[in-house]
């Protein structure tokens, strides 16, 4: 059975548990990596970040950046849900999608291998996590 070790108290927990069974420390990857499926360029971060046209143009060097708003979406930690989320910025002309579905205002949990995009086909960014 797969497990994880709590960095706070050393307890071995089942892999499916989102929090340590003893101290309730969240089992949440510290680093999120977004990789452009078009260019292979990456952005790596450990705290909440907002993404938009400038980042898509310069960091990912993707021509699809022209379809993005100045601020398109944000990636943030939700310690209550023990998850990283993608949440759209309000008022964007093109919807932010996750795995082909529009992201609601409250956001969607990110998973390893998931794909964030503008609409269903533009500016595809694959999600990866680095373990703690």
Regions found by a protein language model. Give the residues of each.
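Forkhead-associated
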Residues: 72-115, 119
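Amphipathic hydrophobic-ligand
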Residues: 68-70
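Intrinsically disordered, low-complexity acidic Ser/Thr-rich regulatory segments
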Residues: 1-66, 76-81, 109-132
């Amino acid at each position: 059975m797969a497990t994880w070790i709590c960095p706070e108290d050393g307890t071995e927990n089942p892999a499916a548990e989102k929090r340590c069974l003893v101290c309730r420390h969240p089992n949440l990857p510290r680093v999120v990596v977004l990789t452009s499926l078009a260019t292979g360029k990456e952005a790596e971060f450990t705290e909440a970040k907002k993404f938009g046209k400038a980042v898509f143009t310069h960091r990912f060097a993707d021509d699809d950046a022209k379809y993005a708003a100045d601020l398109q979406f944000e990636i943030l930690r939700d310690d209550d849900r023990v998850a990283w989320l993608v949440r759209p910025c309000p008022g964007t002309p093109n919807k932010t999608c996750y795995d082909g579905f529009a992201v609601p205002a409250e956001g969607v949990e990110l998973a390893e291998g998931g794909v964030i995009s503008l609409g269903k086909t533009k500016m595809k960014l694959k999600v990866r996590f680095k373990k703690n």
